[in-house]
Amino acid sequence: MELKFSAEVELTLSREVDPAEIEPTVEEFVKEANEDLLQRGVPTGKEGAKIESYRVLEDTIEMEITGTRYLRPHEAAMRVRKRLAERLGRKHRVGVRDLKIPRYEVVLRFDREVTRDDVGYVPVADDVVVEDGTVRLTFQDVDEEMLRRHVIDRVIRLVAWAVEERSELVERVTKVEPGTVVDESGPREIRFDGDVTEEARRRGWVKEFPGRGQWIYTPPMAALFEVLRDFLLERVTRKLGFEPALFPKLIPLETMFRMRYLHGLPDGMYYVCPPKRDPELFDDFKRELYVWGELNERTLGSLKEKLRDPGYVLAPAQCEPFYELLRDEVVDPERLPIKLYDCSGWTYRWEGGAAKGLERVNEFQRIEHVWIAEPEEAERIREELLEATKRVAEELELEWKVVVSDDPFYLEGRLLEDRDIELPDVPSYEFEVYLPFKGERSSEEAWISVGSFNVHGEHFVDGFNVKEKSGRTLFTGCAGLGVTRWVVGLLAQHGFEPEEWPEPILERIDEKFGGLPEVPKTLTWPE
């Protein structure tokens, strides 16, 4: 990719001057700057920046500056401002009070045809023109904050990523091709091929909640959920030495920003808008609600006016508080690894139209394992969790496979990061079980992930400024066992008759509940 830059620059003087008086000084400076100042730091044989033209006014010096990837016009302008101010101060007792860039243009030339759809939405840019293999970005009134925060550099990186790198993001990090099956149980006898959601609904084990992707789980389903959760905790979590923790499920946006989750999956979360704490402010909403007698555009519009901007999300990953626990801390290697788990509540993801049945919901429960350790041990912990999960699936006589994941949730969030961090060869594995009612084994649609096993490398260590006292590398990891989906997987393969269920489940249901609880029936439900 070839880059070219040009900028209109205005240097505001500290007082009005006679242009003829200072123009010789400016002319001399421009010549010297083009030969030396604007070439410093540029590799031999490459071009830096250049002041193409200038004009001296009574209170302003206007310049047209071009640049390359080695020295961009805004960087050149800041050099010019400092050095020219020093020279004008010595010779004419006038300084440079302000730097403005009314217009900044960036041209990106690619080696292939580029369309406007390839580029996509470009924040901050006032104009985007795409012709053949060229993308021309124009920015108006660039201020110092934009320069200080490297906003234009980030826009360039965003466009380059969108055109050249987006489809390669996972492949660049994952050394094994996503979708590769690394282990599997092999086929098992199919005992049930009915639709789990429809059968559970018919029996009254679940009832659909008004919210999309939400269900009420009645006693038979809840009992099965509890014993499966306890079985996983016993055979996997506690057996491997994970300690309990209670993590908040209302997560500040700042935390999601640090995780780079906002960069990667902003459309997959529920956002929380706290109300303005003023009861009188809500009086007109209550009156609107009373008069209209329903939730409509008018009543909801009145409510929206009383809400603050989004400040939180409902936990979409469940591991978020672990990184806040470690934030800005120094870790003692003698106390590693730190291994915690949380299974204290719901996890929320907005699936939108993809929410379907019990197998893909917006609200679900998991056992979330989190850990921090030195790299080799961090990966070993993941392997131990995977092996323990396989043993559980075997005890439950489930058909399963382990697949290299194609969607480590944090990777896309690194697209604007220039820092080089260490990552494992395979960031993420998915543990999937077969759902016979969804189709043949050869169809990816017939498999559902019941566990995700991730080693993040230094991603969160870097984002949350976690240090090891001797400066050694630390990795974090997380592994979520989706208990709600384990229930679906067991019912999909073994059916709804308890006598067909694996012995470990039956024993625990009898021990804990004295048998499978009954559905709380009414005169009209279940049908």
From Swiss-Prot:
One of its GO terms (cellular component) is cytoplasm. Its main location: cytoplasm. Its cofactor is Zn(2+). Keywords: Aminoacyl-tRNA synthetase, ATP-binding, Cytoplasm, Ligase, Metal-binding, Nucleotide-binding, Protein biosynthesis, Zinc. Pathway: Aminoacyl-tRNA biosynthesis; selenocysteinyl-tRNA(Sec) biosynthesis; L-seryl-tRNA(Sec) from L-serine and tRNA(Sec): step 1/1. Binds 1 Zn(2+) ion per subunit. This ion is coordinated with 2 cysteines, 1 glutamate and a water molecule that dissociates from the zinc ion to allow the coordination of the amino group of the serine substrate, which is essential for catalysis. It holds the Pfam family tRNA_bind_4. PROSITE patterns: AA_TRNA_LIGASE_II (PS50862). Its EC number is 6.1.1.11. GO terms for biological process: selenocysteine biosynthetic process; seryl-tRNA aminoacylation. Zn(2+) binds at residues 319, 368, 478. It catalyses: tRNA(Ser) + L-serine + ATP = L-seryl-tRNA(Ser) + AMP + diphosphate + H(+); tRNA(Sec) + L-serine + ATP = L-seryl-tRNA(Sec) + AMP + diphosphate + H(+). It is an enzyme of class 6 (ligase). HAMAP family: Ser_tRNA_synth_type2. Belongs to the class-II aminoacyl-tRNA synthetase family. Type-2 seryl-tRNA synthetase subfamily. This is Type-2 serine--tRNA ligase. It comes from Methanopyrus kandleri (strain AV19 / DSM 6324 / JCM 9639 / NBRC 100938).
